């Protein structure tokens, strides 16, 4: 497919001219296309609505991947955290960059077609309808509310009809015309001055735009939520609070805490969608402050650290499963939900920071099996009931040091696992680490709270052999280890699997790799400008398959603190957000 576009001029704005190319040939994206993506396209953040991170393309295979060559690369102008999850449609790559920038690139050549910049790009009706960044930006955030970590990271975007959707660092959802990059609408869902912001982008489910918010760590008279919106207008259709309020179902699980002191339960990773059941599945994060003793309750604290099944048209809660009731070490379970049918059972697979693989029934939320990988030292989990019990001495007390694996950075984080139907296996980026942690008190006042003071001393996992990075491969449904690959540097991207019997990942030390998905043999590697970081994808244009691997900086935990502490000999440039695209030679 040849990508057709024409050059036009958006006009003078802020004293400069903005050149814009318009996409001429563009097929509106439908619900059917999202459910069954055309071969070679990448229309959802993980390739399909089940969040597999899998490409059915096999032109690049385990037999020829060692011939991969760089076709083009593109660097972002903006500094900030880069964790891009690109989309591909009609030969165009739509990619989010730092600070709310979205660009459309010719996916075969890397040429820029258009660019959207918050507060600069005009709206489609020739007015500037963007929210005022001077009023809503970081400078307006009171120190007591500013959430800092991860702010400005836009992981994924969504595409539907003729619009691109993004959730912003200023607690807004934006719709951009996919042909021109012009702003169509912008809806603010919360007050960024209270610390609210987005890192997870939207998904589309049965014609509704759904996304969850973050920035809920500080005490305020409001809580975190997931919302559904009309994709044409941005109108909010429903809102589900991810913290149970006093007097509502589950409200007593926070004890006697007033609503303003019930913090956390952010939903900062995008969800999945089951079209037949018409349910979206979202994870939620931990309660805050992290430690029970600091937040003032030892209750379960619904709906923290849970998987939620919501009707995308109404926001009604169909079921929930709380993985870690009353969690007390910052062990998130917010991450991706992977939908797989195994042995006639329609299942969800997910893994949190503790490296426990949970298998749930998609219809009922019933636990099918919990499999502890054996890396963590904090708690015991019953594999059939899912009940957890904390090990002796592992419930934090204020001012008392505990020795725990993993650290608060976790074994698993936002770097999403991938599923391959060829091998019936999950490919999971893991970082092996432990921590000496001392939790301190915090004051229960508006604007206070947060994670709570924590003194942290990271150290290598005793069973890691000095390695920080691991690609863990589990057979499904047995959850037995199929193979694992370990190295000194952390694996720093999501995993990508393909029908060519391949799995791709990248690391903190600027390397990108391809492995034989069946055997674990390393078949190809290359090195790029800075740390590999983000969500790799694969696509096809004019019968040619491409592999796109993002690089970037910023973020927290694996991206900065752990390598600095545990692999000080490894270095990287402090900027260089970019995308690198590879293909076989002609």
Task: Annotate the PLM regions.
Residues 42-46, 81-101, 130-172, 197-220, ...:
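Repeat-blade elements of multi-bladed beta-propeller folds
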Residues 430-432, 457, 462-521:
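Loop/turn-rich, solvent-exposed surfaces of beta-rich toroidal or solenoidal domains
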Residues 537-586:
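Blade-level signature of beta-propeller repeat domains, shared across WD40, Kelch, NHL, RCC1
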Residues 211-225, 282-301, 401, 432-464, ...:
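Short, conserved, GDST-rich strand-edge loop motifs in beta-rich repeat architectures
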Residues 22-76, 111-146, 182-191, 235-242, ...:
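Aromatic (tryptophan-biased) beta-strands that constitute blades/sheets of beta-rich domains
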Residues 200-233, 327-381, 394-405, 409-414, ...:
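Repeat-solenoid scaffold signature
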